[in-house]
Amino acid sequence: MMAKATMAFCFLLMLTTVMLPTEGKTIAGRTDCEQHTDCSAASGPVYCCQDSDCCGGVDYICTNYGQCVRHF
């Protein structure tokens, strides 16, 4: 039982490490979406990754490909 739990933990740790971008200025190397004025939004601030790909706000992060991803 303990071996399965350890294997699962190691797998999740490895997966998390691989999935995280290496560039960035925030915790775990993720880059916060920066506020950007060129994107039009219905309400609230709009954030973009690398001046493109509009995000919905501060609850998003940018991948190292410049895509917005919601973080939980």
From Swiss-Prot:
PTM info: Contains 4 disulfide bonds.
Coiled coil: none
Compartment annotation: Secreted
Keyword Protein biosynthesis: no
One Gene Ontology term of the molecular function aspect: toxin activity
Alphabetical keyword list: Disulfide bond, Secreted, Signal, Toxin
Tissue occurrence: Expressed by the venom duct.
Gene Ontology CC annotations of this record: extracellular region
UniProt signal peptide: 1-21
Comment block on domains: The cysteine framework is XI (C-C-CC-CC-C-C).
Protein family per UniProt: Belongs to the teretoxin H (TH) superfamily.
Protein name in UniProt: Teretoxin Tsu11.2
Native source species: Terebra subulata (Chocolate spotted auger)
Organism lineage string: Eukaryota, Metazoa, Spiralia, Lophotrochozoa, Mollusca
